[in-house]
Amino acid sequence: METELDDERDGEVVVVGGGVIGLTTAVVLAERGRRVRLWTREPAERTTSVVAGGLWWPYRIEPVALAQAWALRSLDVYEELAARPGQTGVRMLEGVLGETGLDEVDGWAAARLPGLRAASAAEYAGTGLWARLPLIDMSTHLPWLRERLLAAGGTVEDRAVTDLAEADAPVVVNCTGLGARELVPDPAVRPVRGQLVVVENPGIHNWLVAADADSGETTYFLPQPGRLLLGGTAEEDAWSTEPDPEVAAAIVRRCAALRPEIAGARVLAHLVGLRPARDAVRLERGTLPDGRRLVHNYGHGGAGVTVAWGCAQEAARLAS
């Protein structure tokens, strides 16, 4: 009887962290037959992930080569999920990657992106690429991930932890994002503040992302169901989650310079999220003080959505 109980517990995993990385990792583990409990400090709709613009594209993530591989694995999944956009929140949508040339994607993504081409002058004034990429509506996708986890036999518990050793399972997976700074502790994890403005969509159907080489600012607009997301900012080591009115006005001005109709769009909301940046994603196996297996999966910067499935698959491998 004890042997049967031990065998059953050997299949148990506690995933700590309920953002897109934690949820996706929990789903992959549960669908591979593990008994998964997800512990989350706050509901998914209050995590940093819900503030994400949701465009699939590696942004502020290292190491680049691994991030690209994880992104391509995630692309495979998102392309499948886009067949059910109303349920999953995933759509394949065309738009412009501004200030990006074909040579920058030829080595890793060009073969996987049908229709990738140089943007025309009418589509973008500078050098840019016209691409069809996954755009994920996080307000739909996160609840869908939760339901998929529950359907696979997993459970979700609202629970804050101060020590990873509190997790009572043979395997613990740490997907705490910025929380890893204190929980591990890992001082290499730091916030990169992002602010967005949500407006009524004045009729824009394609996304655009453009980085200014001089200022380092990234300007983007992303059409999501019922709204248009405008961005963005990347403030290093900034902890405030209060929207800055001056920053918001500057975001609207930059977006309106590209599409004038944005200037008069009614503002619906202001959002702020703290990206969990690190000099390199930490995706590796370790041990807790009592010898139990610990898998770290955090530090994805501004690309958590982009690499979620690839990193989840690797984390599941490390947990086995």
From Swiss-Prot:
Binding site for FAD: 18-21, 47-49, 53-55, 161, 176, 275, 301-302, 304, 306
Binding-site positions, D-proline: 220, 275, 302
Protein known as: D-amino-acid oxidase
Induction section of the entry: Not induced when D-valine is added to the growth medium.
Amino acids binding D-serine: 220, 275, 302
Cofactor(s) required for function per UniProt: FAD
EC number(s) recorded for this UniProt protein: 1.4.3.3
GO MF assignments: D-amino-acid oxidase activity; FAD binding
Record-linked PROSITE patterns: DAO
UniProt catalytic activity: a D-alpha-amino acid + O2 + H2O = a 2-oxocarboxylate + H2O2 + NH4(+); D-leucine + O2 + H2O = 4-methyl-2-oxopentanoate + H2O2 + NH4(+); D-valine + O2 + H2O = 3-methyl-2-oxobutanoate + H2O2 + NH4(+); D-isoleucine + O2 + H2O = (R)-3-methyl-2-oxopentanoate + H2O2 + NH4(+)
Main location: cytoplasm
Role according to the record: Catalyzes the oxidative deamination of D-amino acids with broad substrate specificity.
InterPro entries with a match to the protein in the record: D-amino_acid_oxidase_CS (IPR006181), DAO (IPR023209), FAD-dep_OxRdtase (IPR006076)
Gene Ontology cellular component terms for the protein in this record: cytoplasm; extracellular region; peptidoglycan-based cell wall
Family: Belongs to the DAMOX/DASOX family.
Summary of the knockout phenotype: Knockout does not appear to have a significant effect on the assimilation and detoxification of D-valine.
